[in-house]
């Protein structure tokens, strides 16, 4: 099969023929239909990975497709089912899984991510005797992928797979940051730093929650225009004005909730300064390894502000992925306009170049 492999950090991807073994007992082979082009893939191509892992590795962690084969002990899907792939494997037995926080699974966020293996500690990808490794347990930038059954969620067949793929990362991360992590009340104010795929999803989550005003913050006019299309009520162009002053001018006191959807420690500080007393900053973006953010210590007792992180939108994947797709089908979540460009798998490096240039809200590889 064809797959997009990364042989070393900071190098272009190569689309090549590699071998994929059949699924084991609890595993599923998926014919991938679509894979979103996400910043979390790009950082590895750019040489600034979130973690050090084995190589060569087949990237891609935001995907959807059709079940092609199943192992003998698979119980949740059948051949022909449409599925969204989840980049967090949930073991079901660790403390976090047991208390209903599968997105924080110790095993899924530990060994599966770091080692490039599936849950049993081996890889299904290889070229002859040379092993290739799995990215976040799903490797969706390929014609086919094998993953554990716990990494797939069955979805309705009437949802286009290129739209369903977005719920595998960007949309779940952004909408979930609002409805699962922040939980604003109707009428509370929201400011979103970064109007890319995740930021736009935060805006859509804020609309669902009834927040007002909803302020989009970015340095690209075209992204701010797009943010208005998805529900932002105000925009702040940081290439022209100071974000903190502009947000306080709109709200009077700062935003009740600020969301950092970029992964930049300076922006994290700006979001903190733009948060109202008693408000909350929610950090979504992944900064570089070793990066630290500095905050004034006296702000904690004097302003009662809170800063918190959220991973994968606090998702309970088997529950929240279908829930978001039901909202899409009901016309309450706009996925159609989020896909701005589609690419063939052979165009993967062009897709990453366009991501770096900020040309897309979401680019999607179509297999």
Regions picked out by a protein language model, each given a short descriptive name:
Residues 21-35, 48-98, 103, 111, ...:
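Glycine-rich beta-strand-centered segment in the early N-terminal region that forms part
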Residues 82, 189, 279-281, 306:
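Short glycine-centered segments of the SAM/dcSAM-binding site in methyltransferase folds
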Residues 241, 249, 269-273, 318-367:
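C-terminal hydrophobic helical "lid"/dimerization subdomain
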Residues 143-144, 150-152, 156-241, 245:
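Mid-domain Rossmann-like dinucleotide-binding core that forms the NAD(H)/NADP(H) cofactor-binding site
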Residues 275-290:
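ADP-ribose/adenylate-binding Rossmann-like module
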Residues 87-150:
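Cysteine-cluster motifs in flexible loop/terminal segments that predominantly coordinate metals
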């Amino acid at each position: 099969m064809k797959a997009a492999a990364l042989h070393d950090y900071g190098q272009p991807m190569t689309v090549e023929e590699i071998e994929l073994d059949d699924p084991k007992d609890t595993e599923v082979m998926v014919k991938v239909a679509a894979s979103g082009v996400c910043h979390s893939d790009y950082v590895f191509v750019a040489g600034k990975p979130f973690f050090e892992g084995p190589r060569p590795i087949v990237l891609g962690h935001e995907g959807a497709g059709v079940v092609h084969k199943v192992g003998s002990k698979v119980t949740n899907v059948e051949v022909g089912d449409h599925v969204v792939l989840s980049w967090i494997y949930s073991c079901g037995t660790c403390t976090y899984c047991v208390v209903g926080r599968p997105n924080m699974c110790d095993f899924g966020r530990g060994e599966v991510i770091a080692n490039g293996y599936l849950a049993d500690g081996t890889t299904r990808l290889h070229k002859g005797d040379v092993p290739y490794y799995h990215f976040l347990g799903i490797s969706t930038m390929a014609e086919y992928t094998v993953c554990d059954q716990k990494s797939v969620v069955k979805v309705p067949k009437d949802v286009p797979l290129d739209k369903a793929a977005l719920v595998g990362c960007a949309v779940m991360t952004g909408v979930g940051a609002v409805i699962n992590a922040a939980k604003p009340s109707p009428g509370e104010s929201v400011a979103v730093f970064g109007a890319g795929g995740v930021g736009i999803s935060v805006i859509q989550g804020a609309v669902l929650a009834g927040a007002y005003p909803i302020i989009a913050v970015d340095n690209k006019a075209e992204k701010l225009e797009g943010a208005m299309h998805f529900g932002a009520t105000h925009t702040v162009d940081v290439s022209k004005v100071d974000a903190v002053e502009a947000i306080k001018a709109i709200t009077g006191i700062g935003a009740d909730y600020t969301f950092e959807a970029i992964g930049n420690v300076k922006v994290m500080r700006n979001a903190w300064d733009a948060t109202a007393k008693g408000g909350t900053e929610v950090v979504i973006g992944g900064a570089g390894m070793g990066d630290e953010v500095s905050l004034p210590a006296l702000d904690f007792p004097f302003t009662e502000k809170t800063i918190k992180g959220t991973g994968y939108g606090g998702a309970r994947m088997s529950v929240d992925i279908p829930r978001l797709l039901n909202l899409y089908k009901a016309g309450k979540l706009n996925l159609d306009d989020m896909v701005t460009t589609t690419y063939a798998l052979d165009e993967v490096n062009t897709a990453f170049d366009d991501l770096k240039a900020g040309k897309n809200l979401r680019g999607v590889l179509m297999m």
